[in-house]
């Protein structure tokens, strides 16, 4: 039995199967390099027999990866195994993963075979794969719905034929943790040659049990977990790599000191890369890598966090590669959180009136939702009764985009009460053309860090909400725009961010005047 947990990543095989559009070879290689830096022990990167494109991507990754074992999938069919071996032969180290269904439903309805036939096919497949490599994994597809006697029988036969890893998948996410743990315990205790192989688990999340089942399996003797970044995969997805890795790291008391060799500080970066390349947004409340995973909004929680981080944080954001936790300022935040944000921006309590600031903050939070640091500064130092209206407002916007030609836009705004207009040509799409026009009017330089479009409602009357993050002079500003037209909502989001920049500049000017004694 292995001393540590082997992490078998299948983002580029099982994960990619769930995508609406296939990744390019270049994109797959980019993810493979990221997985190698992350420290996965094995990466399953494709199913070579399925297409020429998959064969090419497996071969390309196998040629370039040096520190992780590269694996390819094959059915228990000679031509599949031969194709996998051909694609993998250029690798530093490789594994052939062969599988066959074992549940009565699959054997009878899909394969139209007997279980005895399936055992023979498994033996032949493992032996053929061993002609190419001494690292062969065998999987019992739909083991979660296979009788334990049959699982033990075919696992014993596969190991005798040369399998070095035996995988017990909950292919359709059917098992509950106690059931799955019992299956693994039976394999551990009833298969006489189990000491010659590693038990692997591959869980799907149809009932939301993938992580729990994988961890229960480890407690019962499994030593390899098959998983994907962000849990992407067929239907409801696979076990999420980041969840099992951080659970084992955080709760080593429950796993007898077992660990993985994953460099956890790479988790956030790899998660974001996979999300972007696969065009699969991460839900905000996703464990470990969601944008809210280390965000605290409750006033009671924020007060506890200010006093001692461990009150509401069982692992640090730094442990997955984030800089720090976020104390989100909302209407539920207390004085302690507001004071803490001001302190982190370098302000002493004597610089402002906390009671007045908190009162103004609550009014803004009720209206706006989340309040950012630059909002807090404006509340603290700008008299809201004396002209804190937006300096920049949108009057007119038109744009034109013709195939194969640069986009153009006309924008008219009101800046400090004066109407100004600008024509922009040469934009990379209508939104870019509008942004170029607005920035030309304001003279501001900024970098777009994030642009996110979501639909509010359904049908022709749906609104498009654009959320952006821009960087200006080393500081980040947020903007939100809402309109039925995407170009207009994009323009309103940028104008919203620009007004935040203007308020921040006003605060800076007030501070300079105070220092100068003016």
Curated annotation (Swiss-Prot):
Keywords for the protein's UniProt record, in alphabetical order: Amino-acid biosynthesis, Branched-chain amino acid biosynthesis, Cytoplasm, Leucine biosynthesis, Manganese, Metal-binding, Transferase
Gene3D superfamilies: 1.10.238.260, 3.30.160.270, Aldolase class I
Presence of keyword Manganese: yes
PROSITE patterns according to UniProt: AIPM_HOMOCIT_SYNTH_1, AIPM_HOMOCIT_SYNTH_2, PYR_CT
Catalyzed reactions per annotation: 3-methyl-2-oxobutanoate + acetyl-CoA + H2O = (2S)-2-isopropylmalate + CoA + H(+)
One Gene Ontology molecular-function label: manganese ion binding
GO CC terms, sorted: cytosol
Cystines in this chain: none
NCBIfam families per record: leuA_bact, PRK00915.1-1, PRK00915.1-3
Protein purpose: Catalyzes the condensation of the acetyl group of acetyl-CoA with 3-methyl-2-oxobutanoate (2-ketoisovalerate) to form 3-carboxy-3-hydroxy-4-methylpentanoate (2-isopropylmalate).
Subunit structure: Homodimer.
Protein name: 2-isopropylmalate synthase
Taxonomic lineage of the native organism: Bacteria, Pseudomonadati, Pseudomonadota, Gammaproteobacteria, Pasteurellales
Name of the coding gene: leuA
């Amino acid at each position: 039995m292995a001393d540590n947990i082997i992490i078998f990543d299948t983002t580029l095989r099982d994960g990619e199967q769930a995508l609406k559009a296939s990744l390019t070879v270049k994109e797959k290689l980019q993810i493979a390099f990221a997985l190698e830096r992350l420290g996965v022990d094995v990466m399953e990167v494709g199913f070579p027999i399925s297409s020429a494109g998959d064969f090419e991507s497996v071969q390309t990754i196998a040629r370039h990866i040096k520190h992780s074992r590269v694996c390819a999938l094959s059915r228990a069919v000679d031509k599949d195994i031969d194709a996998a071996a051909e694609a993998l032969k250029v690798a530093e180290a490789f594994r052939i993963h062969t599988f066959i269904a074992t549940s009565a439903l699959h054997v009878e309805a899909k394969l139209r075979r007997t279980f005895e036939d399936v055992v023979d096919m498994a033996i032949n497949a493992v032996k053929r794969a061993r002609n190419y490599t001494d690292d062969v994994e065998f999987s019992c597809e739909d083991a979660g719905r296979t009788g334990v006697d049959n699982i033990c029988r075919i696992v014993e036969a596969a190991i005798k034929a040369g399998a070095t890893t035996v995988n017990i998948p909950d292919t359709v996410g059917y098992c509950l943790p106690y059931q799955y743990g019992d299956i693994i315990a039976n394999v551990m205790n009833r298969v006489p040659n189990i000491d010659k192989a590693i038990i692997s688990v591959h869980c799907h999340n149809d009932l939301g049990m993938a992580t729990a089942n994988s961890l229960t399996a480890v407690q019962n003797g499994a030593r390899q977990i098959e998983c994907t970044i962000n849990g992407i995969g067929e239907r409801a997805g696979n076990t999420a790599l980041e969840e099992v890795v951080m659970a084992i790291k955080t709760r080593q008391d429950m796993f007898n000191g077992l660990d993985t060799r994953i460099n956890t500080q790479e988790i956030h970066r790899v998660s974001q890369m996979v999300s972007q390349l696969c065009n699969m947004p991460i839900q905000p409340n996703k464990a470990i890598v969601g944008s809210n995973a280390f965000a605290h909004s409750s006033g009671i929680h924020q007060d506890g966090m200010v006093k001692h981080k461990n009150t509401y944080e069982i692992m640090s954001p730094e442990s997955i590669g984030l800089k720090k936790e976020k104390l989100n300022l909302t209407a539920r935040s207390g004085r302690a959180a507001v004071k803490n944000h001001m302190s982190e921006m370098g302000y002493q309590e004597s610089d402002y009136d906390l009671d007045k600031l908190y009162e103004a903050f609550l009014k803004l939070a009720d209206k706006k939702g989340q309040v950012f640091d630059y909002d807090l500064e404006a509340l603290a130092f700008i008299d809201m009764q004396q002209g804190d209206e937006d300096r920049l407002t949108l009057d007119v916007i038109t744009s034109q985009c013709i195939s194969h030609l640069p986009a153009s836009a006309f924008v008219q705004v009101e800046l400090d009460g004066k109407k100004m207009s600008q024509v922009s040509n040469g934009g990379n799409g209508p939104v870019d053309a509008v942004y170029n026009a607005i920035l030309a009017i304001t003279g501001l330089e900024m970098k777009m860090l994030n642009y996110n479009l979501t639909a509010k409602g359904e049908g022709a009357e749906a609104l498009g909400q654009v959320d952006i993050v821009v960087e200006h002079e080393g500081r980040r500003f947020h903007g939100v725009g809402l309109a039925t037209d995407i170009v207009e909502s994009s323009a309103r989001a940028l104008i919203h961010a620009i007004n935040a920049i203007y308020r921040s500049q006003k605060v800076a000017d007030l501070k300079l005047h105070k220092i100068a004694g003016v």
